[in-house]
Amino acid sequence: MLPIQQLQELIQGKKVAFIGAGVSHKRCIEQFVELGAQVTLCDQKKSLDDFGDYADTLRRLKVNLSLGEHYTDGFAGQDIIMRTPGYEYYKPALQDALKAGAMVTSEVELFFEFCPCEIVAVTGSDGKTTTTTLISKMFEAAGRRVFLGGNIGAALLPQLADVTPDAVAVVELSSFQLISMRRSPKVAVVTNVTPNHLDHHKDMQEYIDAKRNILLWQVPPCRAVLGFENDITRGMEKDCKGEQVWFTRLHETDRGAFLRESDDMLCYAENGVVTPILPRKEIQLRGLHNVENLLAACAAVWGRVPIEAMRQVGSTFTGVEHRIEPVRTLDGVTYYNDSIASSPTRTIAGLRSFDQKIILIAGGYDKKIPYEPLAPEVLAHVKTLVLMGATGPRIEKAVRDCDGFADSGLTILHADNMQHAVELARGAAKPGDVVSLSPASASFDLYPNFEVRGRDYKNIVMNLK
């Protein structure tokens, strides 16, 4: 039986509720209706018209609706509930549905269940998207057909009919997706784990356990790629079911990818043999954290693609949007967009990628994560700090309380919004300076996501006269 037929067998004639109509669910709703499911859309929007252009599709598909304040009432009597990653797995309404006999799953979980090809998946607090993209491009350079999805690219489940056994699926997974997963990929990569999304998870341990899920359901033969520099990922070695390899920038390992100190060469060690991959000077990506991302990608694809494919991608790939992305140079000042930096560790990596003190725009939605680790890095790498958003006061307090603040010469400015922040940064900048949006915070106080935030910043910068 073909995978798409297996999916149809699962859902045909069943009552299926979708929580929300985000990008991935829109295509899945159409797919499920076509495969014979009785679909109900449960959404906080108050009326069908609130869905904009998609309202016409919902009407055409004759989708049932459970909208408004009591949208979770639509869970009652459902056979299957399709959870969106942003809807917490342990919310009472969802747990009640589970107890009532509903199957709670997601687009990614069903894809993992029915996918006929090898899956390579990446998780971590930082570096997921760049590492996932590097892996996909290495497979493409080797001539493989790649299906890219999860937190990046298009929804995978609606493409199930096109996936063949000789393809490869490369998937980025967040903790929100992993928390309920009971299947793992053939190759699992955990870049690092640091405090993040603590507004969503009940505590740090739940967040760590969600990340561990990428490993726990692996079936040999399989591979786990873990970051050696991170204490938490290093501790996950005990969770590995098959081959376990490291990636490390600061140490030399006998199994995995590392940066050789003697000649600054990215290498791979296996069975006592060390193979050079690429000199670090040829890497196009900015920042030492991206050396780690490239090492992780090489460890993931080792033995699956030729070394030349790794070299080609490593020496030509210039980055993903919103990740230390050059925007423009105006009056001798260079502006960068690092809107992806929604945590202190991500901002720290960005700061360390510059060889001068910069003007930093930071602040945003409060995810209840500590800012004390960011403070000394700000003092070391920032000349002017422009703060905005809900976390602005918390970042400022951490910086002012940090040893060395009084003698640092750091200037702190306060902005009401992004336009104001860019204007303040420009006013503080002199020829030769760097301005970077690297918020160390999520975007949700002012923007729906970091992409919209980054594009607004770029638009403002591009319109400076």
What is each PLM-predicted segment?
Residues 55-59, 374-432:
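C-terminal helical cap/extension that packs against the catalytic core
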Residues 72-76, 85-228, 232-242, 427, ...:
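Phosphate-binding loop of NTP-binding sites
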